[in-house]
Structures are given as structure tokens and as C-alpha cells.
């Protein structure tokens, strides 16, 4: 899993977070603080099972399980597909951005994708 964050120049003033191997392990506080989410792209084109990308409004998440962090946002991507979700008005995250990816929609789901998708999201 490789996670990169790219700062964008004005007038955007935003960040692009890219995780080239999103798994069931939470990646915490990717942007280093609060912000607004504007777009998420999930590239699951190399995997034959659907995935659920989960984002939590926290700087310290625990992915899935009985004591897992509840996701603020859950986005579905079908098998062998790429999906983009755009939020023109943005979704505010006051505590930070933490994410993980699993094969089940349930909050307690912990099953990792056999082939992790690449996920990108744009924040301010």
C-alpha cells in the first residue's frame, strides 16, 4: 500500500490523496487535519469482487470489527469497474480524513480485497 498526498496550487487550494493499495487497514489522518471532501474515485478494474471504500471523520480510525470506527461515508464500487463520486458543495470533515477498503458493506466488515483498488480523493 502506497499513499501519497499532493498539494495543489491556487486557485484550487486542495489536496489529492491517492492510495494505490487500499485495504482493510485504516490509513489515518491522510491530509493532516480537517477539510472538505469534493471527489472520490475508486479504480476496482483489476478485481472481480465489489468493494466498499469507507471514509471516517477522525484522525485515528480502527477499520471494521466489533470495536471499529463507524464510517462517515461508504462508497460502493462494482467488480471490474471504476467509479467516481463528486460532491459539488463538499462534505465537511472536522477531525481529519481516515480511510479503508473492504468487501462488505456492514460496519463490522473486515474482509480485505484480494487485489486492492487504487483510490483517489480531492479535499480542501
Model-inferred region functions:
Residues 82-90:
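Exposed aromatic-hydrophobic patches
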Residues 46-69:
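Short, surface-exposed beta-strand/strand-loop-strand elements in extracellular ectodomains
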